[in-house]
From Swiss-Prot:
One GO CC term, this protein: cytoplasm
Name of the protein: D-alanine--D-alanine ligase
Predominant place of localization: cytoplasm
Presence of the UniProt keyword rRNA-binding in the record: no
Biochemical pathway: Cell wall biogenesis; peptidoglycan biosynthesis
Gene behind the chain: ddl
Binding locations of Mg(2+) 2: E260, N262
Biological process, per Gene Ontology: cell wall organization; peptidoglycan biosynthetic process; regulation of cell shape
Annotated PROSITE patterns: ATP_GRASP (PS50975), DALA_DALA_LIGASE_1 (PS00843), DALA_DALA_LIGASE_2 (PS00844)
Subcellular location field: Cytoplasm
Binding site for ATP: 125-176
Species name: Thermotoga petrophila (strain ATCC BAA-488 / DSM 13995 / JCM 10881 / RKU-1)
Keyword tags: ATP-binding, Cell shape, Cell wall biogenesis/degradation, Cytoplasm, Ligase, Magnesium, Manganese, Metal-binding, Nucleotide-binding, Peptidoglycan synthesis
Family, per entry: Belongs to the D-alanine--D-alanine ligase family.
Physiological role: Cell wall formation.
Length: 303
């Protein structure tokens, strides 16, 4: 099997993608797969036709282009098989506002509103969360407890993103649920609880060793564990996601509040999904092979 490994990309998550890609590359080598690495940059469309000579694309492009449905639509058009969710699901899940609107009657979501213009005060009160519609790795996310902090967040995000989501802040335990697809169906991995040393699970906390305490499995009683896993799987399936992914949320007062779905989650040495997989008895090389094989569960590919 010939594998095209796509890494790097043009988003603000490029460095994380390169780290994910390097780790996947070593795993593919150990597994004995024939592979070629593509460091995706601005001129990638000039070489995209080369992908037709491969059996499958292993996509570890995080953020815009690789995770927002753009790459997936191109590969669908060319009839090239790839890992992860399809173009529509990727597009929906990368846009948090679209995700919330799509899933609002299916799972519990903290109150939210879209803002396109500067405001003096939060329409949802404080504390609140300000975050971009389309971004990953907690880039551009602010927790605001005053008008001053709220205004600062808008001044940072609105010029860059054009619009932001303001969401009610739910105090509670941050949890992430990783999901794999195998020929037996969807497998929900052990729930990971995140206890960052910083104010919340931001970019630094995600990708710096020692900045976050990982609790695996999360200390939940059986009914709480069932609630979290069932909610995460319901969101994942209803959004049409495939292959592998991660669902993030807040567990508070016996309720699990959905926050987002990551359709191309990190695969670095500090990433959540590999940690959950290992807790479930799946070493990294096996995880890579499961993800790779899941690309062949999506039916016939037609150009």
């Amino acid at each position: 099997m010939r594998v095209a490994l796509l890494m790097g990309g043009v988003s603000r998550e490029r460095e994380i993608s390169l780290r994910s890609g390097e780790r996947v590359k070593k795993a593919l080598e150990k597994l004995g797969y024939e592979y070629t690495v593509f460091d995706v940059k601005e001129d990638f469309l000039k070489e995209v036709d080369q992908l037709k000579s491969f059996d499958v694309v292993f996509n570890v492009l995080h953020g815009t282009f690789g995770e927002d449905g753009t790459l997936q639509a191109i590969l669908d058009f060319l009839g090239i098989r790839y890992t992860g969710s399809d173009a529509f699901s990727s597009m929906i899940c990368f846009d948090k506002l679209a995700t919330y609107r799509f899933l609002k009657d299916i799972v519990e979501i903290p109150d939210f509103i879209e803002i396109r213009e500067f405001m003096e005060t939060s329409p949802l009160g404080y504390p609140c969360v300000v975050k971009p519609r389309r971004e990953g790795s907690s880039i551009g996310v602010f927790i605001c407890e005053s008008d001053e902090e709220f205004q600062h967040a808008l001044k940072e995000d609105l010029p860059r993103y054009g619009s932001v989501i303001v969401q009610k802040y739910i105090p509670g335990r941050e949890m992430t649920v990783s999901i794999l697809e195998t020929e037996k169906g969807f497998e929900v991995l052990p729930i990971l609880e995140l206890r960052p040393k910083r104010r919340f699970y931001d970019y630094v906390a995600k990708y710096t060793k020692g900045e976050t305490e990982f609790i695996l499995p999360a200390p939940l009683n059986p009914s709480e564990e069932r609630l979290v896993k069932e909610t995460a799987l319901k969101a994942f399936v209803e959004a049409g996601c495939r292959g592998f992914g991660r669902v993030d949320g807040i567990f508070s007062n016996g309720r699990f509040y959905f926050l987002e779905i990551n359709t191309v989650p990190g695969l670095t040495e500090t990433s959540d999904l590999p940690a959950s997989a290992k807790a479930g008895g799946i070493e990294f090389e096996e995880l890579v092979e499961i993800i790779l094989k899941s690309a062949f569960l999506k039916g016939e590919v037609r150009a």
